[in-house]
Curated annotation (Swiss-Prot):
The keyword Cell division does not apply. Keywords: DNA damage, DNA repair. One of its GO terms (cellular component) is mismatch repair complex. Residues 336-346 have a biased composition (Basic and acidic residues). This is DNA mismatch repair protein MutL. InterPro entries: DNA_mismatch_repair_CS, DNA_mismatch_repair_MutL, DNA_mismatch_S5_2-like, HATPase_C_sf, MutL/Mlh/PMS, MutL/Mlh/Pms-like, MutL_C, MutL_C_dimsub. This protein is involved in the repair of mismatches in DNA. It is required for dam-dependent methyl-directed DNA mismatch repair. May act as a 'molecular matchmaker', a protein that promotes the formation of a stable complex between two or more DNA-binding proteins in an ATP-dependent manner without itself being part of a final effector complex. GO terms for biological process: mismatch repair. Residues 336-355, 361-384 are annotated as: Disordered. It comes from Listeria welshimeri serovar 6b (strain ATCC 35897 / DSM 20650 / CCUG 15529 / CIP 8149 / NCTC 11857 / SLCC 5334 / V8). CDD domains: HATPase_MutL-MLH-PMS-like (cd16926), MutL_Trans (cd00782).
Length: 603
């Protein structure tokens, strides 16, 4: 017998909605803080006990709620943020579904005090979504919400929560992102009475970066900016020498909303291309403003994922912006490696939330900077801390002046070789100090830029083979190469069908290494076969990297003084001479001052 279809009760519907909206304590914090932001708050206090499982309290100084609207706020899909269908396509607020408050209330004990500041305040208490008490009373302007006994009526949900440190890390991560997205709001977050995050809300994004990641990271950041007809991008990109083992430090913010978008992350990585070692990722914060009509935030209840109608154009703008910003800088890292950096490279399993909540000790930087003592904020001294950070962070101007554009500054200075160490590293000097150059990485960069340019012009420089090369392949690879023939021709591999599962090659680019033509051709074909589908841009890039790596001088190769001098002079002509195509550093510098300090000649 078929079962009857019945309408679910509001209580059950709210619990189902809570399963999507309220996954863990961090979800509660996110929804309530976003409501506070939408209410126009300038100061938001977040007080958490036992990673939110015991109690979560959010206090803001926003617009508050009228007394007659307080009970309505806990009804499903009741909201003040949109009125009609047209508003759904021009969402200017972080919340708009009207699901957060009823969903949170349905799985917790919740109390709220709110006032618009014009009339008496209102207090309301709910348990499991049911209103237990509502009364008028005195309250300051704004809203205070306290959530306790989370998931008391859905014990199965508690089984899926992680350890307290993990849940606290999730909360901290969300608050870090919200603080980065809204530097004009003061966030004050504490756990069990201990302050974990404090920002002053003065609108300076770099100060927020310092508060979250530490002053040393903020010092290593440069401003980036770009705009088009559709997009306005600003933010800070941290120098490539400071990187991480995961993508957690990439923050993309659209219209004040932190979002996750794979295409934009790929665009950021493309902007850092060849500047980062393989498997390493940048630290960057981008704030992107656009017309709400071209971004759809109504994709998922958590609103972390969005759809962009001009995603490709935005990605290209981001990549180009980052490349241009770093192209103006001299990216030679200091020779000294701090203990903290060593420990970071050994183990990076610490969540971004906990990494640098205290201001770290001074570490060597690429730029000159004032000496800054270690400083740990006290509970009473947050305003002084913010002033301290502001005063000690240098300002970088990433804009090129017209006169600078006419006479571009050398990317690396003239260096005079003085010897070779272990037949691998070149030692050079000038008036600025000592330079150590990885000879393989240096020539790899030079050859990479040469091949990258040549691979785009293969049709003009072809050499006929006296003896054509015949290559045989398994059926599956033969079929795939048939599909890739056009792309392969653009990188210098011209395949003609030659019998069953075979191709013949009659010519190759003139810049192929002599006596290694067949090896080179097979390497390029292997690159094309290594991925199910590959773009011509990626194939060219991978081919240039592969050829430069294989054809560069290796370690344990002795060079004459003339060879070293020629290599360094050629390196100075490279467009990006600071890293090899794999992102490893080419040059490390010890300034004269650092050397004199090591030998105690200066104090």
């Amino acid at each position: 017998m078929a079962k009857h279809i019945v309408e679910l009760t509001d209580a059950l519907s709210n619990k189902i909605a809570a399963g999507e909206v309220v996954e863990r304590p961090a979800s509660v914090v996110k929804e309530l803080v976003e409501n506070a932001i939408d209410a126009g708050s300038t100061v938001i206090d977040i007080l958490v006990e036992e990673a939110g499982l015991n109690k979560i309290t959010i206090i803001d100084n926003g617009s508050g709620i009228e007394e007659e609207d307080v009970a309505t706020a806990f009804l499903r899909h009741a909201t003040s943020k949109i009125k009609n269908e047209a508003d759904l396509f021009r969402v200017h607020t972080l919340g708009f579904r009207g699901e957060a408050l009823p969903s949170i209330a349905s799985v917790s004990h919740l109390s709220m005090e709110t006032s618009t500041g014009e009339t008496k305040g209102t207090t309301i208490s709910l348990e499991g979504g049911k209103i237990m008490e509502q009364k008028s009373g005195h309250a300051r302007k704004g809203t205070q919400i306290e959530v306790s006994q989370l998931f008391f009526n859905t014990p199965a949900r508690l089984k899926y929560l992680k350890s307290l440190p993990t849940e606290l890390g999730n909360i901290t991560d969300i608050l870090n992102r919200l603080a980065l997205a809204h530097p004009d709001i003061s966030f004050r977050f504490s756990h069990n009475g201990k302050p974990l995050l404090q920002t002053n809300g003065n609108g300076d994004l770099r100060q927020v970066i310092a508060a979250i990641y530490g002053v040393s990271i903020a010092r290593k950041s440069i401003p980036v900016k770009a705009e088009s007809l559709d997009f306005n991008i600003s933010g800070y990109a941290v120098l490539p020498e400071v990187n991480r083992s995961n993508r957690n430090y990439i923050s993309t913010i659209i219209n004040g909303r932190f979002i996750k978008n794979f295409a934009l992350v790929k665009a950021i990585q493309e902007g850092y291309h060849t500047l980062l070692p393989i498997g390493r990722f940048p630290i960057i914060v981008l704030q992107i403003e656009m017309d709400p009509i071209i971004v759809d935030v109504n994709v998922h209840p958590a609103k972390l994922e969005v759809r962009l109608s001009k995603e490709k154009e935005l990605g290209q703008l981001i990549s180009q912006m980052i490349k241009e910003a770093f192209h103006q800088l001299q990216l030679i890292p200091d020779g000294e490696v701090s203990k903290k950096q060593k420990e970071q490279q050994k183990s990076e399993q610490i969540q971004m939330s906990f990494e640098e909540n205290k201001l770290p000790k001074e570490t060597p930087t690429l730029f000159s900077k004032p000496n800054v003592p270690e400083y740990v904020p006290s509970d009473e001294d947050t305003s002084r801390e913010d002033d301290f950070i502001l005063e000690t962070l240098p300002t970088y101007d990433s804009k090129i002046q017209p006169e600078q554009a006419e006479e571009p500054k050398e990317r690396i200075p003239k260096m005079y070789p003085i010897g070779q160490m272990h037949a691998t590293y070149i030692f050079a000097q000038n008036e600025n100090g000592l330079y150590i150059i990885d000879q393989h990485a240096a020539q790899e960069r030079i050859k990479y830029e040469f091949y990258r340019e040549k691979i785009g012009e293969v049709s003009r420089e072809l050499q006929e083979l006296l003896v054509p090369i015949v290559l045989e392949f398994p059926t599956d690879e033969y079929v795939r190469l048939e599909e890739q023939k056009t792309k392969l021709e653009e990188v210098g591999v011209f395949l003609e069908n030659f019998g069953q599962n075979s191709f013949i090659i009659r010519a190759h680019p003139t810049w192929f290494p002599k006596n290694q033509e067949e090896e080179m051709l097979r390497e390029i074909i292997d690159e094309a076969l290594s991925a199910p589908s590959i773009s011509i841009h990626k194939l060219r890039e991978d081919t240039a990297i592969m050829m430069s790596c294989k054809k560069s001088i290796k370690a344990n190769h002795y060079l004459t003084m003339q060879d070293m001098e020629a290599l360094l002079d050629t390196l100075r002509e490279a467009s990006d001479p600071f890293t090899c195509p794999h992102g490893r550093p080419v040059i490390i510098q010890y300034s004269t001052y650092e050397l004199e300090k090591m030998f105690k000649r200066v104090m």
